[in-house]
Amino acid sequence: MILDDIKKDLEKRLSKKRFIHSSGVADSAVKLAKRYGANPGQALLAGWIHDCAKELSLQDMQKIVEDYGMKVDTFLWNNRALLHGPAGSILAQTKYEIIDPEIQSAVYYHTTGRPDMHLLEKIIFLADYIAPNRNFPQVDIIREKAKKNLDEALLTAYNSTINHLLEENKYCLLYTSDAAAE
């Protein structure tokens, strides 16, 4: 499936706000890819599709994951905000015919991160975090760091997320904190 067809499908499937966000993530991802030597085409495509499953119901996401035979931990399985990454990685392959494992992996881990992320995973995680429509404490600091040092920006984003989760008394996935400790 070509990018124009994917965008048309996303425009139908996603809310206007989510579609605009995906466009912003794609633009941010391309800029980061050019700055840090990643493939801009991969970054563009991964940026566009990273939230392709975001607005599905938890039950629909679970069905996609189950039908595909993917195993995820219990916390992901029961968390709509996080399960859209794995479900989206499946849709990338099954709906959008994207067979590139780096793109699929970048979509899978864009909400949680993981230790030893490859360059495209880092770029999509960070592009989603610093997208133009994001407005939260430290986002401008992270945007500036992203222009200078990808790993430093990533670490600041991880720490910001972990601190927010702790303040809200919410569960933090072990591989998110492991990635930050790396």
Per-region residue spans from a language model:
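Non-catalytic interface/linker regions that flank or bridge core catalytic/transmembrane domains
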Residues: 1-2, 166, 177
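Divalent metal-dependent catalytic cores for phosphoryl transfer on phosphate-bearing substrates
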Residues: 8-12, 32-156
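Flexible, glycine/charged-enriched surface loops at secondary-structure junctions
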Residues: 171-173
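Conserved small/polar residues in nucleotide/adenosyl-binding loops
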Residues: 175-182
